[in-house]
Design a protein with these regions (language model features):
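Bacterial N-terminal signal peptides that target proteins for export
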Residues: 1-9
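Interaction/scaffold regions that mediate signaling and macromolecular assembly across diverse proteins
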Residues: 24-279
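Sec/Tat signal peptide C-region and signal peptidase I cleavage site
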Residues: 19-23
Length: 279
């Protein structure tokens, strides 16, 4: 089984083209963000983001993909969201402990993504917001629109140069939301030092047990492109990927994965995760 599955992974990886470049970035540490204070007891207030999520995220949604009411966000909520983002950027995040930092970066990424969509709505896909530098760049991920401790950062920086290399926790992929139907769910809760572990576990379980994550379709294993783009985060090969899926799979899926010996296909739905978008 291992040889067949690995061969499928390799073939698929070779097929990933330039169109997916922003999603296939390597984890490359930005050393200055390693600074932290393990003795700090300071807590960051994410209540504004929590309130926004409860008001504007539809969860659960019949499709199994949490949705955002982008077109229904009130002017007051828009203003509060921008104030929250300004407050996060004003923090000296290096003075906080690792748990507070992890929640901070996840919330910053998600809140800023939502703000980008709202400010440019209506859009059919986040990839239509072409503000990243570079001739082949697509989407907003490379645009350095945030300023933290005097440094300009992009969404790509947060994901690939801070969160992934510092924490080395593949569940981060289930926490970051790219405003698309193919993404793991945007949780209706803000991350915090106290709830991050539970939310990361919840996100992994929800995604893997939904068809956009992992599913068997007509004797073919269909998985999210996340597992191709970021295969290195999930281990050294097909066996590690399978072990990861089985760890979170419900009994029926886990049993099917254990017996599976076929090929693999991957895809990703970049349509906006708005309330009106049909699956």
């Amino acid at each position: 089984m291992g040889r067949i599955f690995t061969r499928a992974i390799v073939v698929i990886t070779m097929l990933v083209g330039a169109d997916w470049a922003q999603a296939a970035s390597k984890a490359e540490l930005w050393p200055r963000w390693q600074k932290h204070d393990p003795n700090s007891r300071q807590q960051i207030d994410h209540s504004v983001w929590e309130s926004f999520l409860k008001q504007n995220v539809v969860a659960p949604h019949p499709s199994g993909v949490n949705r955002v009411r982008y077109d229904g966000v009130s002017p007051e909520d828009q203003k509060s969201l921008k104030s929250y983002l300004q407050a996060l950027q004003a923090l000296a995040i290096s003075n906080y402990n690792r748990d507070e930092q992890k929640a901070y970066w996840i919330n910053l990424y998600n809140a800023f993504t939502v703000d980008l969509i709202i400010s440019r709505f209506p859009v059919a896909s986040i990839r239509d917001i072409n503000i990243s530098p570079g001739l082949l760049a697509r989407g907003p991920w490379g645009a350095k629109l945030l300023t933290i401790e005097g440094e300009k950062l992009s969404l790509d920086d947060i994901e690939h140069r801070v969160l992934r290399p510092i924490w080395r926790d593949n569940r981060v992929h289930y926490a970051l939301n790219c405003a698309s139907l193919g993404c793991p769910n945007l949780q209706p809760r803000a991350y915090s030092a106290g709830n991050s572990e539970a939310l990361l576990e919840k996100g992994a379980r929800e995604f893997i047990n939904h068809p956009r994550g992992v599913s068997l379709q007509k004797d073919k294993l269909q998985v999210s492109s996340i597992y191709v783009w970021f295969q290195e985060d999930f281990g050294h090969g097909a066996a590690d990927l399978m072990e990861h899926w089985q760890e979170y799979a419900e009994p029926a899926l886990a049993g099917a994965l254990e017996k599976y010996q076929g090929g693999l296909a991957h895809d990703y739905d970049w349509r906006l995760n708005g309330v009106e978008t049909k699956p």
